[in-house]
Design a protein with these regions (language model features):
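RNA pseudouridine synthases
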Residues: 1-234
Length: 234
């Protein structure tokens, strides 16, 4: 009923994907793969699809009900604190940004709500746990309790630990504009450290749609993240 793959970055997920597309090939020629969730363009990792409409309904119900545990590994700039960080609040637009699709995280603990006129406000919850910390970088595990656009990236940026290689929420959002116009300089690429954002969907845990057995889907870190991690943490 369901199939999954370890998606490479920049392989776009589209509702109209067919067996002739890269994703159709990944899933063994499924004629109309029904994607149960999405990843940002530069995020790698586990992607789950349904073979049938019935399986798609069951899968989407699991995501909506919170029965799915979404686990990410992420390299961030800065020394992330030890222990567990619970980040709850709201995700809203950022109209003053040069990047139209940029989002802003408003932490619940600060008591600051998004502007009343913003019609695209969503509550969000993410838990972060430090895995390793060395020099200017930290390796963090993130568990997304909600599935908001750019949730992990915007939250980490608001906390002061932007994702390595993130052109929108990283060291300078104008990097994204230069990236779009193919004008990134050598200094820009050095500041980014990686040509992609270092965010990886490492695993999903969810009940099987028929048996109810807990499924544990895992995807290893891609080579470029492993190489950067090892250069600092080995």
């Amino acid at each position: 009923m369901w199939r999954w793959t370890n998606r490479a970055t920049c392989l776009v997920i589209r509702a109209a994907a067919t067996s002739a597309t890269p994703f159709g090939i990944c899933f063994g020629g499924i004629e109309k793969p029904r994607f149960l969730h999405r990843l940002d363009r530069e995020t790698s990792g586990v992607v789950l699809v349904a073979r049938t409409a019935e399986a798609a309904r069951a899968g989407r119900e699991a995501f909506v009900s919170g029965a799915v545990r979404k686990i990410y590994q992420v390299l961030v700039e800065g020394g992330f604190p030890s222990g567990t960080v619970h980040a709850a609040g709201w995700m809203a637009g950022e109209p003053d940004s040069l990047v139209r699709k940029r989002r802003r995280f408003f932490p619940e603990k600060d008591g600051i709500r998004p502007p009343a006129g913003d019609g695209d406000v969503r509550c969000c919850r993410t838990t972060f746990r430090l895995q390793a910390r060395r020099g200017p970088l930290s390796l963090v595990v993130a568990v997304s309790k909600t599935g908001r656009l750019h949730q992990i990236r915007a939250t980490l940026s608001a906390l002061g630990f932007p994702v390595v290689g993130d052109k929108i929420y990283g060291v300078d959002e104008t990097l994204f504009l230069r990236f779009l116009s193919d004008e990134l300089t050598a200094a820009d690429r050095s500041a980014l450290r990686l040509p992609r954002q270092a965010l990886h969907a490492a695993g999903l845990r969810l009940p099987h749609p028929v048996t109810g057995t807990l499924l544990r889907l895992r995807a290893p870190l891609p080579a470029e993240m492993v190489e950067l991690r090892n250069s600092f943490f080995s």
